[in-house]
Amino acid sequence: VLKLRSMRDGPGDDAARLTRFGRALRASALDELPQLWNVLRGEMSLVGPRPLPMAYLQLYSDRQRARLRLRPGLCGLAQAAGRNAVPWPLRLRLDAAYALRLSLGLDLRIMLACAVLVVSGRGVTAKGHATMPALSGRQISPPEAPPAQG
């Protein structure tokens, strides 16, 4: 997956590795533009769960693994709910719910919500983090019912 680099490689938390230019790229979501090439190549979709590190696979519940049936997307239901400000249990629950309710109407609502969030600059970071916290087994809630349709 093609992506602009906004952090330095190496040890340390995201705040220490995030460059000044990278912070501006992430705030504006311009770091995602190269991923349009991935969409054109068929490796990603416009809408779908955001790609996550392979190391997270072992942490998913059976229900959360539903996200793996779909191509990763530029924008997903979890991002539409608040980008990086969405906590992991809710993010994974929303990704699983999206995988079970695919529709053009839902995709259009997700794209609109993501556009509004990007323009507003909301949700770029999780509270207390330079980006978002890493996923760990402690952050995953038991499987839950999909959120109510609204």
Where are these regions (language model features)?
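Conserved small/aromatic sequence motifs within transmembrane helices
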Residues: V1-G150
